[in-house]
Design a protein with these regions (language model features):
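Glycosyltransferase catalytic domains, chiefly GT-A lineage
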Residues: 1-173
Length: 173
């Protein structure tokens, strides 16, 4: 699964001695120094932002749900986090445990699946496809009791005029 590259990149950065890592997908860029992100990572051990009102039951295939021992009904209570912005401060046990579970899910094949709703991968009227690492990160964050940092405050879908609080802008490529 290509989304495993995020974990390999984070692992490599840790091996190079970096302790605080802010992953940004290629569609995200800093519009100013990410101080709020860095401060949150230092304070909380992580930075996770929500992904609208989407829930894990909508974007997680049956195999991934089975890996985590969840039903689709249980997953309906789990909000999605964005896979495009993930910050971890590995000096914090919370970040290390999140990463451990994230890597375990990747190694178990839970990232694998189709972006579109294939009947052989998912069931239920609400199922729309699989979001790979994002689905796993959402379930892990929920189980660990991690909160989502504010949406559309420090991270914003690009517009010509954005709030002064925005540090990272997102736009499709």
């Amino acid at each position: 699964c290509p989304y495993g590259m995020k974990l390999y990149a984070m692992q490599w950065a840790m091996e190079q001695g970096h302790q605080s890592i802010l992953w940004l997908d290629s569609s995200a860029w800093c519009v100013k120094y990410p101080k709020v992100h860095q401060d949150a990572m230092a304070r909380d051990g992580y930075y996770l932002v929500g992904n609208g009102d989407w829930k894990a039951d909508q974007w997680t295939n049956d195999a991934c749900l089975a890996h985590f021992g969840l039903t689709r009904e249980e997953a309906a209570a789990i909000p999605l986090v964005s896979g495009g912005i993930i910050g971890l401060d590995f000096r914090n046990e919370i970040a290390r445990e999140f990463f451990r579970q994230y890597a375990e899910a990747m190694n178990a094949g839970a990232f694998k699946g189709s972006w579109t709703a294939l009947p052989e991968e998912g069931s239920g009227e609400r199922y729309r496809g699989h979001r790979h690492d994002q689905s796993c990160a959402s379930i892990i964050a929920h189980r660990m009791g991690l909160f989502r940092h504010p949406e559309q405050t420090y991270d914003y879908y690009y517009q010509p005029t954005m709030p002064d609080t925005v540090e990272i802008a997102l736009a499709g490529l």
